Amino acid sequence: MEDTTFLEGANLAGITTLMNNLHINEQANLEELEKQVMGKQQSFPTDHFDEELNGLAKSLGINFNDPEFSLDSAHSVISKKPSGRGSDKVHGGIRRDSVCTDSICSDSVCSGSIRSGSIRSGSIRDGSIRDGSIRSGNIRDGSVRSSKTRRGPARNSSSRNDRGYSLSTHRKKYAESEASQKTAISKRDRKNHYAESEYSEKSIKPSTKQVDRLINHLRSNGDPNSFYKKEHDYERKTKLVKLEKINMLLTYLGNEQISTDDIKIPTIDSSMQEIDDVIEMLTLRNVGIRYSSIAEEILIGLARGLEIVFDGTREIPFLNYRPDYTGLHNTFMIKLFKMRYETSQVVGNLVQNMSPLSKICLELGPSLLLYPALIRTKHKASEDLYNLLQKGPEDPFTAYNEIHETLKKNNK
């Protein structure tokens, strides 16, 4: 048989030259390990199948090279050994010493019926053997009769019918079991293949970009050390960008008078994981304050709108009710200050999938509603204070109380 083995590790030739010696155990002999991998052999599945088939045929006494066992042969001898006694052993309804000669007609022999040691060379159907008859399902005197025997159907045809039915039923059940076994094996192999491919994709995907960059660099320069130097420079630049982002967040939080003393500020020598953790903490603290401010502005703007619409002078149709919501925004401010965390969570869940432009509109929208009310309140307070000062009450205590009441009224 042709040798179809091949080296499984042939595609790994020269892999040790791509490895970074700083990340490998010093006691490991890379050249020896590469030789062991390169020397490993693997055979094709068809060779394994042929070995199992030949071993099974040998255990059953079958020789595939013998022409007497060929299905296409007209003279197929099953067994020529007669028993030492008068009664011959019958296996599967067919005698071992029966000989298939030229006188057996075509309708008396078919493939796949004789199960003497799994030899499938012929079958006896409901038809008759013309050069001799089988009596009572067995051959008498342990021999095949000569051409002088009476030609015609066998006497015990019912037994042969039962035997033929049992053989056909057995063949049918065997074919069904074999088909179900193949289906189960194919499903199991397909499931294992998908599991292995999914595992290989998960394990290889994170390092694919780095391997591609290394291969491209080796094709252009051919020096692995220069590649690792570039990787180190790239990591250093990434750290510098992230440290600058940390400084911007610290400056913004400092302007908002938000404490950051509990956060350890990383340096250029810190690991990338530490820098990312600090950025995440500062970002959460920043957006938490911003999101709570957005919620407060929106709700206070709604309260201002209710104050303008329902100031005690307008009546609700069909209810004959005149609500007065003057000063509602002050109550909202006190309540929302106690729920800054909840309001930041609500707004954060709403804006996490929004675009930057939408976030800007959400940030500036409440200010458009609040600005006219703030300007109107400021102008009114200035006018009232000016009129009070121009009036000039004689009692200073009375003037102080009037100014205080005016400011308190305008701040509502």
Curated annotation (Swiss-Prot):
Q: What are the inducing conditions?
A: Expressed in the late phase of the viral replicative cycle.
Q: In its UniProt entry, what is this protein called?
A: Uncharacterized protein B407L
The lineage's top-level taxon is Viruses
Q: Which UniProt keywords apply?
A: Late protein, Repeat
| Similarity comment text for this entry | Belongs to the asfivirus B407L family.
| Swiss-Prot/TrEMBL sequence repeat ranges | 112-116, 117-121, 122-126, 127-131, 132-136, 137-141, 142-146
Ranges for the region named 7 X 5 AA tandem repeats of G-[NS]-[IV]-R-[DNS] are 112-146
- Which residue stretches belong to region Disordered? 116-208
Origin organism is African swine fever virus (isolate Tick/South Africa/Pretoriuskop Pr4/1996) (ASFV)
Low complexity bias located where? 116-126
Q: Which residues fall in a compositionally biased region of kind Basic and acidic residues? A: 192-208
Q: What does the organism's lineage look like at the top?
A: Viruses, Varidnaviria, Bamfordvirae, Nucleocytoviricota, Pokkesviricetes
